[in-house]
Amino acid sequence: MSLGNVGINADYSWDAGERARLLQSPSVGTSPELRRLAGGTSPAGAVFIVVNAALGAGLLNFPAAFNAAGGITAAISLQLVLLLFIISGLVILAHCADACSERTYQEVVRGVCGRTAGVLCEVLIAVYTFGTCIAFFIIIGDQLDKLLGAMMHTTAESPVPWYADRKFTISVTGVLLILPLSLPREISVQRYASFLSVLGTCYVTVVVVVRCIWPDTTIPSHEISSSSSSWLAVFNAVPTICFGYQCHVSSVPVYGSMQQQDIRRWGYIVTIAMFIALCVYTGTGVCGFLLFGSDVDQDVLLSFPSDDIAVAVARAFIILCVLTSYPILHYCGRAVLEGLWLRFTSQEPGEEPSKERRRRVLQTVIWFLLTLLLALFIPDIGRVISLIGGLAACFIFIFPGLCLIHLKLSEIHEHKSKSWWALLSYGVIMVTIGTFIFGQTTTKAIFVDLVG
């Protein structure tokens, strides 16, 4: 996830320094010269980047989301309805980026909706990336449990050695691999993350689809529900869908990097990209649900036997993707926090290197320790996705809707046309839907955590 998905796939084809400048707030010394990209992204390249931003860790949770929604028909129908708003939100953001001449999501929100909305957006981006980093640690623990179990030939009833304990393996992996990759001021690992992420997510989809068509004899048959017990059950899948398709934060700099910044062309690009993401997510969701039914785990790979070699390769791919993506997500969150810090302390960006280094190390260590500690005590990625999926609704619905409303209200017309009223009403509808999704999913997630 990218910062947009902020999931496994979080990479653009730019170097780390350029990405840092694009992610920082306007007050962090981002001059027009530094923000101007050499060349431009082709339409095909833009499609790949948007797909890369959308596909991510949410893929593992889609079969469980299909089960929670009450079956295949309900889940696919919900996806198609939400995709209309997801695609329109991407187009609205590009239109607003043209209107205010900004190149990042938070700058567009700040430029169109004002300072308060911009600060709120930056805070939510930081919280969203923080939550996704927690999900990454949980994914590492899930996959290592299965891989170590296969190597040691242990069963569910076997005692787990101390060196194979989940908390120990997550901690060691984090301290030895993730923390050193997260400390540098600039990150070079992201140039490899894009290829690994796309390859990993596609491989997981292929494995799940193939296992559904030619099931392993060791996988027992499971009950498949054809309808939900209540029409309200369909909302159980909303957080996963929002988390999976959320690429809106990444989309603004992608649009700004295009060779020809045309709204109509951009509409075609994001439609194609979302169709590709729909095929991948739906393929994984449908086949994973048909394989395991109501017994599917929150992470679909956990439902497969430990000794399945093809699935073991998929687990190794996912671990590698997460190891390269956590530093990128932390880097994005740190850039936003750094911008907020410099703005509210009225400091100039050109400070002493030693002071900046101490603050960066302190920020990184605190971020790392908090995400690690929370991941050790959260049982599965479903708990995290159910919470940050509500935040994803803010980036998909609320902020694009607010931008559209402010943009329309800023236009001076003596007589408002029907199209003006239609667009204003659409913005209000987006904000209303986003607020409902955020409130409903967040409240339910907190309630489940407190009760369970």
From Swiss-Prot:
<feature type="transmembrane region" description="Helical">
    <location>
        <begin position="361"/>
        <end position="381"/>
    </location>
</feature>
<dbReference type="GO" id="GO:0003333">
    <property type="term" value="P:amino acid transmembrane transport"/>
</dbReference>
<dbReference type="GO" id="GO:0140902">
    <property type="term" value="F:L-glutamine:sodium symporter activity"/>
</dbReference>
<dbReference type="GO" id="GO:0030424">
    <property type="term" value="C:axon"/>
</dbReference>
<feature type="transmembrane region" description="Helical">
    <location>
        <begin position="272"/>
        <end position="292"/>
    </location>
</feature>
<feature type="transmembrane region" description="Helical">
    <location>
        <begin position="195"/>
        <end position="215"/>
    </location>
</feature>
<dbReference type="GO" id="GO:0140901">
    <property type="term" value="F:L-asparagine:sodium symporter activity"/>
</dbReference>
<keyword id="KW-0813">Transport</keyword>
<feature type="transmembrane region" description="Helical">
    <location>
        <begin position="46"/>
        <end position="66"/>
    </location>
</feature>
<dbReference type="InterPro" id="IPR013057">
    <property type="entry name" value="AA_transpt_TM"/>
</dbReference>
<keyword id="KW-0406">Ion transport</keyword>
<dbReference type="GO" id="GO:0016020">
    <property type="term" value="C:membrane"/>
</dbReference>
<feature type="transmembrane region" description="Helical">
    <location>
        <begin position="309"/>
        <end position="329"/>
    </location>
</feature>
<feature type="transmembrane region" description="Helical">
    <location>
        <begin position="234"/>
        <end position="256"/>
    </location>
</feature>
<dbReference type="GO" id="GO:0015186">
    <property type="term" value="F:L-glutamine transmembrane transporter activity"/>
</dbReference>
<dbReference type="GO" id="GO:0006868">
    <property type="term" value="P:glutamine transport"/>
</dbReference>
<keyword id="KW-0812">Transmembrane</keyword>
<dbReference type="GO" id="GO:0015182">
    <property type="term" value="F:L-asparagine transmembrane transporter activity"/>
</dbReference>
<feature type="transmembrane region" description="Helical">
    <location>
        <begin position="74"/>
        <end position="94"/>
    </location>
</feature>
<keyword id="KW-0472">Membrane</keyword>
<keyword id="KW-0966">Cell projection</keyword>
<feature type="transmembrane region" description="Helical">
    <location>
        <begin position="385"/>
        <end position="405"/>
    </location>
</feature>
<keyword id="KW-0915">Sodium</keyword>
<feature type="transmembrane region" description="Helical">
    <location>
        <begin position="419"/>
        <end position="439"/>
    </location>
</feature>
<keyword id="KW-0739">Sodium transport</keyword>
<protein>
    <recommendedName>
        <fullName>Sodium-coupled neutral amino acid transporter 7</fullName>
    </recommendedName>
</protein>
<comment type="similarity">
    <text>Belongs to the amino acid/polyamine transporter 2 family.</text>
</comment>
<keyword id="KW-0458">Lysosome</keyword>
<dbReference type="GO" id="GO:0006867">
    <property type="term" value="P:asparagine transport"/>
</dbReference>
<feature type="transmembrane region" description="Helical">
    <location>
        <begin position="168"/>
        <end position="188"/>
    </location>
</feature>
<keyword id="KW-1133">Transmembrane helix</keyword>
<keyword id="KW-0029">Amino-acid transport</keyword>
<comment type="function">
    <text>Symporter that selectively cotransports sodium ions and amino acids, such as L-glutamine and L-asparagine from the lysosome into the cytoplasm and may participates in mTORC1 activation. The transport activity requires an acidic lysosomal lumen.</text>
</comment>
<feature type="transmembrane region" description="Helical">
    <location>
        <begin position="120"/>
        <end position="140"/>
    </location>
</feature>
<dbReference type="Pfam" id="PF01490">
    <property type="entry name" value="Aa_trans"/>
</dbReference>
<dbReference type="GO" id="GO:0005765">
    <property type="term" value="C:lysosomal membrane"/>
</dbReference>
